[in-house]
Amino acid sequence: MWLTKLVLNPASRAARRDLANPYEMHRTLSKAVSRALEEGRERLLWRLEPARGLEPPVVLVQTLTEPDWSVLDEGYAQVFPPKPFHPALKPGQRLRFRLRANPAKRLAATGKRVALKTPAEKVAWLERRLEEGGFRLLEGERGPWVQILQDTFLEVRRKKDGEEAGKLLQVQAVLFEGRLEVVDPERALATLRRGVGPGKALGLGLLSVAP
């Protein structure tokens, strides 16, 4: 895997367009690994990091193949050199994590996906997803060692053929941060590669871990 940090230029018209629409952002970032995507060798994940005062927006991108960022428009972003990321996970290893995800449930009657409402429901969703993916949340004195740093709704327009404006969608985006433990290294690595939950094209699902 490869990790790239992009510092977007707010003066760039293309960057402003992408910041206003996650689908456009995903389309732009996909250009850096377009051939691998076409050949089915790629799984692009990305996350817009929390804003820090007046600092320019930062996007973290994870790819399975080495990206070519020369495809970006001139002045779009400051691109830090891609770094290879090959974590040697071990059972019992404890790590810090960050994840922006869409915690939701599917209604049995209609099959419609709806957002979870309470913090407890969202943390329980996270616990289940991590356990399915070879991790477990660490426990603190007051429960799972996790914080919800942001809880917002992304507003995006998804156009279908023949539509001019497209349908306005609201997608819940929750930023989790905390500590976890590796239970099954093989499943855990697969989880890092494929991401967690729905909404990958909206900048959701990238699970970042560090010692």
Curated annotation (Swiss-Prot):
It holds the Pfam family CRISPR_assoc. It is an enzyme of class 3 (hydrolase). Its EC number is 3.1.-.-. Changing residue 26 to A: 99.8% loss of cleavage activity, binds RNA normally. Changing residue 24 to A: 71% loss of cleavage activity. Changing residue 158 to A: 64% loss of cleavage activity; 99% loss of cleavage activity. Changing residue 157 to A: 85% loss of cleavage activity. This is CRISPR-associated endoribonuclease Cse3. It comes from Thermus thermophilus (strain ATCC 27634 / DSM 579 / HB8). The lineage of its organism: Bacteria, Thermotogati, Deinococcota, Deinococci, Thermales.
